[in-house]
A protein has these predicted regions:
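Conserved pre-motif I regulatory segment
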Residues: 1-38
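SF2 helicase catalytic motif II
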Residues: 121-153
Length: 154
């Protein structure tokens, strides 16, 4: 399936905006890609579309729980299987979510930076078929500083 077909099927748009297509083509060709776009510029589509075009799970690392929940809801509303793991969830909820990523044919797993370093995530990650990793809202890292979250100090 080509990228424009995915865009049309899930978002209802006939064409990409601005540099979206350039970013998508770069990601789709397997290159590490930094996509810088303004708020409301459609950044999420630039990693969601190529992730949908390939098998496997897209791991999305983002520090903002509200954004995670919003993105997951938006994807689910479009019929795309997505799930989030964040603080405030019980261990059982986290295990179920991660196992769903192994066995449940999910396309997107949204996770906070702190969760990357947990034993349960590291263990479950070994069984996941991750095809793509995205860091969303990466500007927050420099805004918060080096000592905001310990995971970034490794």
């Amino acid at each position: 399936m080509d990228y424009k077909s995915i865009l049309k099927q899930y978002w209802g748009y006939d064409s990409f905006r601005g540099i979206q297509e350039d970013i998508i083509n770069s990601i789709g060709s397997g290159r590490d890609t930094l996509g810088l776009m303004p708020t409301g510029g459609g950044k999420s589509i630039t990693f969601q579309v190529p992730a949908l075009a390939q098998p496997g799970l897209c791991l999305v690392v983002t520090p903002l729980i509200a954004l995670m929940k919003d993105q997951v809801r938006n994807l689910r509303d479009r019929g795309i299987k997505a799930i989030a793991v964040y603080s405030g969830m019980t261990r059982e909820e986290i295990v179920v979510a991660l196992e769903n990523c192994i066995f449940g044919d999910y396309k997107f797993l949204y996770i906070s930076p702190e969760r990357l370093d947990t034993e349960i995530f590291q263990t479950k990650l070994k069984s996941m078929k991750v095809s793509m990793i995205t860091v969303d809202e990466s500007h927050c890292i420099s805004q918060w500083g080096y000592d905001f979250r310990q995971i970034g100090r490794a």
